[in-house]
Regions:
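Structured beta-strand/loop patches that form or line metal/cofactor-binding pockets in enzymes
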Residues: 1-45, 49, 56
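Structural preference for beta-strand elements that scaffold enzyme active sites
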Residues: 33, 141-145, 187-191
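Metal- or metallocofactor-binding catalytic centers and their adjacent structured scaffolds
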Residues: 37-126
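Short catalytic-loop micro-motif centered on adjacent basic/acidic residues
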Residues: 45, 190-193
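Glycine-rich, aromatic-flanked loop segments that form ligand/cofactor-binding clefts
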Residues: 115-157
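Active-site mouth loops of central-metabolism enzymes
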Residues: 143-175, 194-196
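Alpha/beta enzyme core
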Residues: 172-188
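Conserved small/polar residues in nucleotide/adenosyl-binding loops
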Residues: 202-204
Length: 204
């Protein structure tokens, strides 16, 4: 079984004006969908960052994957390392457009995107759940957790409309956000992305 085709599709979806230690989220989150197809018709999917520097690496890697056995993950890693090493000066000079996509993580980010797609293809070929290739399931279900952010009411620049969740810059507004998540979605676990504001006396 060999990889016959690789497609990298950039996507963008709306993101709220969420605050973090490095600033504010962009109006759109950029991701990429990776699809590999083998010469015997199996398909594997993965996903990763979708900013320009990340896409450049993904596009360069995909060209070298044709003919690779999707079970050959060491070969995949060697290809990714070679691509990143060849373009290291350009990667270091580029701006980080998506959190986590800077040059120091370029190998692991690109490798993991294609690794998941290869593992998916392996599982489909073997007709087993992917989790079985990773040692087996520990449990059948995992509950979702809510994620609270300090946030503005809307993105700073026009023409972006106000965010449906409203402003959350105070203790009361964060609590209201948590209650809304619980009431509308039934969350039982809630995490807070702190560190965006200097609220040393804040108690939640």
């Amino acid at each position: 079984m060999k990889i016959a085709r690789v497609t990298v599709t950039p996507i963008a979806f709306k993101d709220g004006p969420l605050l973090n230690a490095s600033g504010i989220h962009e109006p759109y989150a950029l991701r990429s969908i990776i699809e590999i197809e083998t010469d015997n018709g199996y398909i594997g999917l993965g996903e990763s960052y979708g900013d320009a520097p990340a896409l450049k690496i993904l596009d360069l890697v995909k060209e070298q994957l044709i003919g690779l056995d999707p079970f050959n993950l060491n070969g995949l890693r060697a290809i990714v390392r070679g691509v990143v090493a060849a373009m290291a000066p350009a990667s270091n000079a580029g701006a980080e457009l998506a959190p986590g996509s800077h040059a120091s993580k370029a190998v692991s980010n690109a490798y993991s995107a294609f690794e998941v797609a290869c593992l998916d293809a392996q599982a489909r070929y073997l007709n087993v759940p992917l989790v079985d290739l990773l040692g087996g399931a520990v449990r059948k279900e995992i509950p979702f957790s809510a994620y609270l952010f300090f946030k503005y009411a809307q993105h700073i620049d026009s023409p972006y409309a106000p965010d449906g969740w409203g402003e959350a810059l105070s203790e009361e507004q964060i609590v209201a956000q948590a209650r809304k998540m619980i009431e509308e979605n039934g969350f039982k676990s809630i995490k807070l992305k702190a560190g965006a504001l200097d609220l040393s006396l804040m108690h939640i």
